[in-house]
């Protein structure tokens, strides 16, 4: 509990200072581009919320080390492992000059470091032929780095509205913490709760008023952390199905895969370029703006931005709740994954055609 509170208040207070003194750093830290296809804010806002989250993790880790608390070593190792992903992400936030490929490579390096020091490798996914391939160390290492980097990028993709990516990460981490508690894996429980505290400190300033954004540094850090913890939970506990890891991250994973398919196959475009057809973008444009109007004052527009996120929180819960209920039943989890995909596609098509179901209003 002490680590949770320390993480929360460190994040909360450090981000308060970032916001309070933004006039000193806004020339570098503020997101002033209001015209891009994925830009839905109406004023210049600092996008270095990830700095507060990282500081919270680092301070909590150092405090745990000084007090010789349990799992302080693992916490500090995970924080240090996250450095390449976080530093490249926040450098992009400050300079706008770090390409997506470099950020992905940095996150893959972070995954490799975490895998080496914490033995966080993907060795099974519950499919016989693939599990045999993953028994080969080089394949396991490569797949782990790819998966963690992909999930971190997925969190960056869904980070489009106030509170969206941060709350989905909190929900996913609480699911991980619950299953860790069920299997008595206190290390995973501790690492998940510490990150929940750090994100919660950021969330208070981000939602609903959007006083600060997560930024690439924050999104990659959170995605990396969630990815490594799901891998550790499965690899350390044979009772936990690998499909729990898939379902608990189903929304960001499928949003990314669906985006790649939509751009490459359906539209014939470069999948790496930003566009305005993400599910969260469509909900905002075709539901929120239609319901509340678009000719609003900046403060009202910021609140409208925030009204988008709860829809996606509910959608992500469609996969996370079954993951929590049936975390050791792989076939049920596979079926739930298919059901989630079907629901996602049906809802996406409905919103595109302005025919949203009544329960989605």
Annotate each predicted stretch with a short phrase.
Residues 20-46, 258-302:
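Cytosolic, membrane-interface loops and tails of multi-pass inner-membrane proteins
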Residues 1-257:
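"…together with the soluble PPM/PP2C metallo-phosphatase catalytic core" -> "…together
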Residues 238-243, 260, 272-273, 294, ...:
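Extended hydrophobic-aromatic, low-complexity segments
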Residues 18, 254-266, 270, 327, ...:
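Membrane-helix cytosolic exit motif
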